[in-house]
Amino acid sequence: MLENYKNHVEERLKQGIPPLPLNAEQVSDLVELLKSPPSGEEDYLLDLITNRTPAGVDPAAYVKAAFLTALAKDETSSPLIDKQHATKLLGTMLGGYNVESLISLLEDDEVGSLAADGLSKTLLMFNAKHDVIELAKNNDNAKRVVESWSDGEWFTSKPKLPEVIKAIVFRVDGEINTDDLSPAPDAPSRPDIPLHALAMLKKTMQDPIKTIEKLKESGLPVVFVGDVVGTGSSRKSATNSLLWHIGEDIPFIPNKKQAGICIGGKIAPIFFNTLEDSGALAFECDVSNMNLGDVIEIYPYEQKVIKSDSQEELCSFEYKSNTLLDGVRAGGRIPLIIGRSLTDETREILKLESSKVFTR
């Protein structure tokens, strides 16, 4: 498995993209390797289980969660992962297969506190939140989780946007539709975000990917600027491709990105929504004086953009919704909605007034 995987890594490297996330079969093999690691491969194996295995309810996540749970409960062992580290890793898996395990570990004297840390930041709890609330009646770790949810710590622990964001412009003229960002002939590769993203704008401009890479050499975040952005059919893949190039890595989640900045003279409503879902800062304003390679300063609270060298104001703007900045901070509109409702429901059960940490 390891040899095949390393060959796959080499092949993908030639295309300038990361390897595919591990599948369930590969994770099963990885588990055996972690139990008795070959000499010299220790760090590599740890990176695979930590950063290259999907989270949530992916079949590979099931295998990962089962192994980490067995480690945390002393049902198996690995020289590389003790029960404390196993519990911490369970806490990075977003929700799904890790939830039941973390709840049961709240009652463990050795790792209960670490399980509480993980659950405090886990939003995809669904009905399992009631189990934690019930357990909190006589378990201090569970009580801490419930208090954390009610205080909205999953949100307040994330950094706010800075007062000013200095960025470099990747400008595409004219109308950029979703087929430009995610071409139909390349549809088979859409589930493989990094591979599909190589096709972005290939019909529209020469060497778009090389252009973006060159802009990144400035060390500044790249902001996507277009006259009319995201028209055409609804395609989440269009957002995925754009954010692959201008977004930020999601910790512990392979081959997917969030955040990023998109400015359009006009942004199509459905495309705007998918950007918002992914935690991007997206807004409409006059882009006529923003050119490829310009360094700009975006003031997200004062709602203006200025040119960095001349300090000339290029445009002012308004957000389409008053909760947009909360969504950016939360890592997307979807985590914001789910997390806010977890906080609200917990406060309701505790008979507390509505939380003030969110913009309503």
Please describe what each predicted stretch is.
Residues 24-32, 55-74, 94-106, 125-136:
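Amphipathic alpha-helical scaffolding segments comprising HEAT/armadillo-like alpha-solenoid repeats
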Residues 187-306, 311-316:
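Feature captures the catalytic cores and cofactor-binding loops of soluble hydro-lyases/lyases
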Residues 146-219:
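Conserved, function-defining core regions and hallmark residues within catalytic/recognition domains
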Residues 36-40, 73-81, 104-112, 136-140:
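Short coil turns that connect the paired helices of HEAT/ARM alpha-solenoid repeats
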Residues 144-163, 299-360:
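Intein/HINT protein-splicing elements and their conserved insertion hotspots or analogous self-processing inserts
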Residues 15-20, 42-59, 80-95, 101-104, ...:
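Structural detector for internal amphipathic alpha-helices that build alpha-solenoid repeat scaffolds
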Residues 2-31, 36, 324-328, 333-337:
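Amphipathic alpha-helical packing elements
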